[in-house]
Amino acid sequence: LLIGWCCMNFRLTKGNFLKTGAYIDGDSAIFTFAAEKEDACSIVLLDKSGNTACVLDIPAEYSTGSLYSVRVHGFCGNEYAYYFKINGKRCIDPYATRILGREKWNDKTRSENDYEIACGIDNCDFDWKNDSFPEITRDRMKLYKLHVRGFSMDAAGDKKHKGTFEAVSDRINYIKKLGFTSILLMPVYEFEEMTIPVKHDIPEYAKPKYSIRDEQSVSTNKQNDKVNFWGYTSGNYFAVKASYASDASDASNELRRLVERLHKNGMECIVEMYFPDRTDHNLILDALRYWVMSFHVDGFKLLGDKLPVTAIVQDALLSRTKILYDGFDMSVVPQNRTYENLYIDKEEYQFAARMMLNHINCNMYELLNQQKKQGENAGFINYISSNNGFTLSDLFMYNDRHNEANGEKNADGPSWNFSNNYGCEGPSRKRFIREIRKLKWKDAMLLLFLAQGV
């Protein structure tokens, strides 16, 4: 059966409704995606130059419920990119395991093709050999949080490797020598780091009238240079950030090699996942399972409200995967679990510690409770500084935040940080101020190391 227009001899049959997304199955590919039976749906295949190679119109007979599923016989996964067209609108597969078009970080030339991206299929041919999960217990766990690009941009050697998984992999021994057992990666799923201008259609009668001279002086190509460096935004949760790889076409395997090397060193890899409020709960669960099975990650730090936390903690496949979140309903946690995989990650500890260190309304009873707290069914993640607010250095150097230079009018970040500048706002040349600050840094680290949590 040939459907749509196409120069290739593809044959379509019904697919597999139990697995959403696109994947290779023998000499064919199966595409399963969400759409209503009444929708006009097609799969657009692109060649390696990004040009349309084939359009496959999908009839309603291949739909069940709100899903379409079709098997495309004769499909070669590495030859084509794809996207869905639903009722004439270009749609990116939320289950795509590769995203094409963001291979270079903050690539301003993308404006030339309206920032378009397409989907690809990860071949998942990595040989894990005898890889095993370290399963580090919470009494031994020490967590090192990093941003792949920021952590390794100053890496020595080949410029190609700066800011990549490979550069992080080269620093595993450094992290291990510091005494850390686990690394926490800020988002490494594919996300849009660029600020894409929103287009608005203006009726002809409302368009401004320019003279030829005026038109020459009007810039129609203004770009917002703000970059989402951290990645806390909705994303393509099944694809690895291609610009974090030394070889963008092999980003998935480069991350797998990083995880494999961590495991060989007895260390864990935990990844942050941010899900906005309206994210489909089935997609969230599928994404977490996929990262465990495909990338062998050891845990997740979950960010976002209204997440299906109960379903996550009850999921049998995730029962030995560390879950970091700001709270759990312990009444729904299975009682027969032998591995402690739940960790409460919130800012309670840092506030109590900062107030004591900087002598700001310190409550010693509260601090001692924070120092000794340890749940029966869940551990606690303790920290005094993080990427969400003051660094440890800033904590004893500034009374107030100073983010004027980042274009947010000094409004981003917490307005109250329980900090103290000890006599001078910002860096100081005075010896006694510098000595006080050094002592405070040491006090803070000692306080944290003596706490019962992670």
Predicted regions: what is each one?
Residues 296, 309-454:
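Conserved alpha/beta catalytic core and glycan-binding cleft of carbohydrate-active enzymes
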Residues 124-186, 190-191, 229-231:
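An acidic-aromatic substrate-binding cleft motif
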Residues 8-26, 53-55, 62-145, 153-159:
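The feature marks proteins involved in alpha-glucan
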Residues 35-40:
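Short proline/glycine-enriched turn/loop motifs at strand-loop junctions of beta-rich domains
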Residues 157-163, 195-264, 275-294, 405-426:
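Aromatic- and acidic-residue-enriched carbohydrate-binding clefts of CAZyme catalytic domains
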Residues 33, 84, 146, 175, ...:
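Conserved, mostly hydrophobic/aromatic
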Residues 254-257, 261-332:
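Active-site neighborhood of glycoside hydrolase catalytic domains
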Residues 27-31:
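Structural beta-strand segments of beta-rich domains
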